[in-house]
Amino acid sequence: MNTTSPAAPSSSGVSFISLLVIIVLSVALAVGLPGNSFVVWSILAKLRKRSVTALMVLHLALADLAVLLTAPFFLYSVAQGTWTFGLSSCRLFHYVCGVSMYASVLLIMTMSLDRSLAVALPFVSQKLRTKAVAWRVLAGIWVMSVLLATPVLLYRTVHLGLNNRSLTCFLKYPSERHRAFHLFFEVITGFLLPFLVVVASYCDIGRRLRARRFRRSRRTGRLVALIILAFAAFWLPYHVVNLAEGFRAAAGKALGSGPVGRRLLLARHVLITLAFLSSSVNPLLYACAGGGLLRSAGVGFIAKLLEGTGSETSSSRRKGTLAQTLRGTPASPEPDPAESLTASTNPLE
């Protein structure tokens, strides 16, 4: 991520910011670490047939876990008021956060495109939506995330803080032009383009469903809204600050210079922690989407929520029906088209 470290605030007058960072990071760890571990366990241990969507949810949870596993190091640094883990750890931990950020954003974007394709071109979606294609897409997402996050390795360094006593894991650029480029690059690739794709995909889904007058389940509509709102709520403020800093850097203004620069720097220290909080929210969204499944299936509700999802299951059902027809065996009745399309618009189906 193109950020200063959560441990960066070290001058007097920012103790409140440090306390807020500690509280938010602690909440993210307390909720996200067991929550995402539960999602991974549910998919690997409880789900016998993993659909394409289940694989994406699994990788989303793994990306979130990777971020959360770095949180204790940042918590310790904030509490101590200095970075004590050296240059290699400074670069590694922030690089892991950057890779996970891109992976999470690209996975959410891919899931929204997958749902949009399933509604717009269902037969094409069935042909493309196979495990082999899914694994290639997932591999591509991780490779792209690794590449997009590489500027973190180039610009991260450890140096003395403003008080000349504490060490800070910080972004240091050769020039303000480099800083402006990195800021704009991260805003565009890490938020703007993926967010536009997510919004466009769900707008297209809604438009097609309204045009065809299909019913939409309350659970589906609620989950779609929650995913988009959570995506925007956690990442929009951070990238707005990045955008403002990018314009300041392009104008040749140094980081933290002037009253506006100092406010933006303090705002970033808080908004960085929202990235950690965003890594803990997805299990809560699944619990909201589960509804009655949480009460009826207990700890297996994630597996029930993802069980038989995607077009792989429906394709198998159609192949079985065709075989029955060729043998002269009566086929089981097809579900109502409206119900099929309604189900296919669920991002977790």
From Swiss-Prot:
Receptor for extracellular ATP > UTP and ADP. The activity of this receptor is mediated by G proteins which activate a phosphatidylinositol-calcium second messenger system. May be the cardiac P2Y receptor involved in the regulation of cardiac muscle contraction through modulation of L-type calcium currents. Is a receptor for leukotriene B4, a potent chemoattractant involved in inflammation and immune response. It is found in: Cell membrane. It is a multi-pass membrane protein. Pfam families: 7tm_1. Its main location: membrane. Glycans are attached at residues 2, 164. The lineage of its organism: Eukaryota, Metazoa, Chordata, Craniata, Vertebrata. Belongs to the G-protein coupled receptor 1 family. This is Leukotriene B4 receptor 1. The chain crosses the membrane at residues 20-42, 55-75, 92-113, 139-159, 180-200, 223-243, 270-290. The gene is LTB4R. It comes from the Eukaryota. Residues 43-54, 114-138, 201-222, 291-349 are cytoplasmic. It comes from Bos taurus. Signal peptide: none annotated.
